[in-house]
Amino acid sequence: AVLVSVMLSQGQANAQFGFPRMNMDSLNALTNADHADMMSKIGVTSLRPGKDGYSTDPAIGANYDQYIANPYINYPDALTTFDGRKVKNAKMWFKVRRPELVKVFEDEFYGHIPANVPDVDWQTVSEEKVMVGQTPCICRTLAGVVDNSSCPEISVTIQADIVWPESAGNNIPVIMEYGFAVGNSPMMMMPMGNGPQRKPWKEQVVERGWAACTIVPTSFQADGGHGLRQGIIGLCNKGEYRKPDDWGTIRAWGWGVSKLLDYFETQPQFDATKVAIEGNSRYGKTA
């Protein structure tokens, strides 16, 4: 399947905070415990204080002037391999350069997806006829139930929904978003932001005869260190702390979308080779 991603840097800034409300002291305690465990594993005893984004004192405030940011100027050439060879053709890119770049991002940024990630069983929770703007549509709510036989104490379900025009036929493109609610709710249909109001994105999508899909990342991996022993990461680790090169939340969110793509490949209504995804803030980085 071909997946196109779009990152939205503006809009609803807190879109990724979709986890249920919990006692903040408990969340902080769990986050701090996870942080301390990882610090111990990598042999780091302290971190330098971060800059204050609100202070005007140059000694402690964040810098917003690009001219004095001391940018890194020696960027490596994307078309030169780590051992100094020039990439001469597409075959060399896909066989040599691209894999070594992917490995760097896995090692240094996103972590590795474990080999023991369990299967996902996609189930239809509901399917109903709805109106999206002026377009008669079908809305299907999905639950991707993850096999937890290896650790029954941890249950994981991917929440998603997809809406498409009744008259669309088969093999239609899909526009996906990382969101925080499923179903034909007013929150999912309303315009966002303070600028000129346009039609909600789902309305624009279905008017073109396409499908609009929302996946809820926090349904299968919480947005924060407090949830790293739960969700899909916790399930794969059987409730234990992560190793330094294990995957993190953003990688886990991406895994969830890959499972949804697998589902699209089994459904004649959707063309899994024509899928785009967008998100805001951390959801944008994930997309």
Residue map of PLM features:
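Boundary at the C-terminal end of the N-terminal hydrophobic targeting segment
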Residues: 9-17
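Surface-exposed patches in mature extracellular/periplasmic domains of secreted proteins
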Residues: 47-52, 112-120, 272-277
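Glycine-rich nucleophile elbow surrounding the catalytic serine of serine-hydrolase chemistry
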Residues: 279-287
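N-terminal cap/lid segment of alpha/beta-hydrolase-fold proteins
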Residues: 90-91, 95-98, 107, 112-174
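Cap/lid segment of the alpha/beta-hydrolase catalytic domain
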Residues: 170-272, 278
